């Protein structure tokens, strides 16, 4: 009996121990878009000290409490602090002001900054014509982060903003998950390089390979080896052995996995000593998917159908959950109502291309061919339609995932 999606995922994730990932410390500039492997706490306050949010003058709020346009308060300017300079140590800050630039430390004894444009500047003095509330335009030490407070969370993707935050608190290295070494083999005598300018009758360009390379890199993998083989089991076996000798732990293949005359991958994997965990899942697209373990090489094999859309579905709904489990990541589901009624094959869980409407509903594209690529670019989400129904009425909540 063909496996349900949930049963197949359970079998897949049961083998995640075959792909142990180490934690490694990597220089900050090499961690972009990788996943943090540990929770991090702030090693210091941010800002590190009280500093000025404006170009202006530091003074005491009580010295200008009685200021008015008719009776401005005149304060001598006794110094200047630029960003990066040490503030002057004043014997008595009463009744005086100190010029400060944005980001400069606040001299001791002052509790407010008044902007340059809000004073009248005189020779070596300023005139203030309105009371200023204490604390105005002062960034307090630790108001953004306190030492020891949470900084970045385990599993967080290290975006440019995350790297900025880590740099601001002096982190030169970050703990990230090691990259899983993956080998990628596409198959098919009819498949030619994607850059080939012209095609002969019957040929197709290898569109799945660049997709998988980019997707694997985004998922934190090292694409260690890449190859394409024609419909030749012996050549396929030789390349697979070569990849394993290079330390590949996850072998990802596309094509030759269904029931046709040229679908040699299942038998070739068996001859290589792989143990098939499942072959075929009750889904559309992607039904012929095969998952196996390679005991001699301490690795796993995910053999995907060759149709491009089937490849994207198996990458999203099998490859991604496997890699997330390696890093103990959890994904929160999102459910939205259908914008229109949908008919689907009963008995198959369908992953169909869709878009969100302005009303926050999900519209399922009527074009769901597993070879149709344009709608992939035009879609924004996958709509997950359950196996046990052939008709879902408009308004029915369904789970959706971003493409």
Curated annotation (Swiss-Prot):
GO BP term (any one): Mo-molybdopterin cofactor biosynthetic process
UniProt cofactor note: Binds 1 Mg(2+) ion per subunit.
A Gene Ontology term for the protein's cellular component: cytosol
Cofactor entry: Mg(2+)
Reactions performed catalytically: adenylyl-molybdopterin + molybdate = Mo-molybdopterin + AMP + H(+)
CDD domains xref list: MoeA
Gene Ontology terms for molecular function: metal ion binding; molybdopterin molybdotransferase activity
PROSITE patterns, per database record: MOCF_BIOSYNTHESIS_2 (PS01079)
EC code: 2.10.1.1
Pathway terms, separated by semicolons: Cofactor biosynthesis; molybdopterin biosynthesis
Keywords recorded for this protein, A-Z: Magnesium, Metal-binding, Molybdenum, Molybdenum cofactor biosynthesis, Transferase
Entry superkingdom: Bacteria
Role, per record: Catalyzes the insertion of molybdate into adenylated molybdopterin with the concomitant release of AMP.
Family (UniProt): Belongs to the MoeA family.
Name used for this protein in its record: Molybdopterin molybdenumtransferase
Taxonomy of the source species: Bacteria, Bacillati, Cyanobacteriota, Cyanophyceae, Synechococcales
Gene designation: moeA
């Amino acid at each position: 009996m063909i496996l349900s999606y949930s049963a197949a995922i359970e079998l897949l994730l049961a083998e995640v121990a075959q792909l142990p990932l180490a934690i490694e410390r990597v220089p900050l500039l090499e961690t972009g878009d990788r996943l943090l492997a540990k929770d991090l706490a702030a090693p210091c306050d941010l800002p590190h000290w009280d500093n000025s949010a404006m170009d202006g003058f530091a003074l005491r709020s009580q010295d200008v409490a009685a200021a008015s346009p008719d009776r401005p308060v005149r304060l001598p300017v006794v110094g200047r602090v630029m960003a990066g300079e040490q503030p002057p140590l004043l014997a008595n800050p009463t009744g005086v002001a100190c010029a400060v630039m944005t980001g400069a430390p606040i001299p001791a004894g002052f509790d407010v900054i008044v902007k340059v444009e809000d004073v009248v500047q005189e020779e070596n003095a300023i005139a203030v014509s309105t009371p200023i509330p204490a604390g105005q335009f002062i960034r307090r030490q630790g108001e953004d982060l306190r030492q020891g407070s949470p900084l970045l969370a385990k599993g967080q993707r290290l975006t440019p903003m995350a790297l900025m935050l880590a740099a601001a608190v002096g982190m030169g290295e970050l703990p990230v998950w090691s990259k899983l070494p993956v080998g990628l083999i596409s198959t098919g005598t009819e498949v030619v390089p994607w850059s080939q300018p012209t095609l002969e009758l019957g040929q197709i360009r290898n569109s799945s390979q660049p997709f998988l390379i980019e997707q694997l890199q985004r998922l934190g993998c090292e694409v260690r080896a890449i190859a394409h083989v024609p419909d030749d089991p012996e050549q396929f076996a030789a390349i697979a052995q070569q990849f394993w000798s290079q330390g590949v732990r996850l072998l990802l293949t596309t094509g030759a996995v269904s029931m046709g005359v040229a679908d040699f991958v299942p038998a070739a994997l068996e001859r290589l000593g792989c143990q098939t965990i499942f072959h075929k899942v009750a889904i559309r697209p992607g039904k012929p998917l095969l998952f196996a373990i390679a005991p001699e090489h301490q690795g796993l094999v995910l053999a995907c159908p060759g149709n491009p859309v089937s490849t994207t579905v198996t990458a999203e709904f099998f490859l991604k959950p496997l890699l997330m489990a390696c890093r103990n990541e959890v994904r929160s589901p999102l459910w939205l109502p259908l914008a229109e009624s949908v008919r689907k094959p009963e008995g198959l869980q369908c992953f169909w291309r869709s878009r969100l409407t302005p009303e926050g509903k999900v519209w399922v594209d009527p074009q769901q061919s597993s070879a149709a690529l344009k709608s992939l670019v035009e879609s924004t989400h996958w709509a997950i339609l359950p196996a046990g129904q052939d008709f879902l009425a408009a308004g029915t909540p369904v789970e959706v995932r971003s493409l």
